[in-house]
A protein has these predicted regions:
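Cell wall/extracellular polymer interaction/catalysis modules
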Residues: 13-159, 166-183, 188-191
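Hydrophobic membrane-insertion alpha-helices, especially the h-region
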Residues: 1-8
């Protein structure tokens, strides 16, 4: 099994990976936060054009325009998805991820995924997020596999949710807990 994974997905290098720049999204995100009453201190960006096992999700300090932390983020396993290429949908039952602006809503716990945050979709591309039960949650699978491969093999870790490592979810929890205003999550895919 491990051998097949290495052949199919490659061994992820432990050398310094190229740094990721989210500069082109920061102005638009800050304006959205300012106009709609979101935290102007922090936001979460998810760049679906990056490989799922690499630094695809980022916590951004909007005051300094700096990246505080990054981590892996699995995409949904719905129809048309592969480990290399996500497809997107807002339809119930699609098991695909959605793009756009989301409000990070209430925190809760479940027996299946543990700590989780509900998401409210704010755009036409994700307005069914609450009905679809799209969440931010973690998976040990994502936490382990991102050390081995740049592309996370599709699994039940995500049916459209933003599934990250347990360590990254704790960092997201920390900024959500200390913020007096809701945090914006913006998911996008560059061409």
């Amino acid at each position: 099994m491990i051998f097949l994974l290495l052949i199919n997905f490659g061994i992820k290098g432990y050398w310094k990976m190229k740094s990721y720049s989210f500069d082109s999204q920061l102005k638009e995100v800050w304006e959205t936060c300012h106009e709609k009453g979101f935290s102007e201190d922090y936001c979460i960006l998810v760049d679906f054009s990056r490989p799922s096992g690499e630094d695809r999700i980022a916590i951004i300090d909007l005051n300094t325009s700096s990246v505080l932390d990054t981590g892996p983020c699995a995409h949904g396993r719905g129809k048309g998805n592969s480990a290399w290429k996500p497809s997107f949908s807002n339809k119930e039952g699609s098991r695909c991820s959605s793009l756009g602006h989301f409000k990070i809503a209430e925190k809760s716990y479940s027996a299946t995924v543990g700590l989780r945050f509900a998401l409210d979709g704010l755009d036409d591309s994700n307005c069914n997020a609450r009905r679809r039960n799209i969440l931010i949650h973690s998976s040990r699978y994502v936490g382990i596999m991102h050390h081995l491969t740049s592309y996370l093999p599709l699994s039940d870790a995500s049916w459209g949710c933003f599934t990250t490592s347990p360590a990254m979810l704790k960092k997201i929890e920390s900024i959500c807990d200390k913020s007096k205003k809701p945090i914006l999550l913006y998911a996008y895919k560059s061409s």
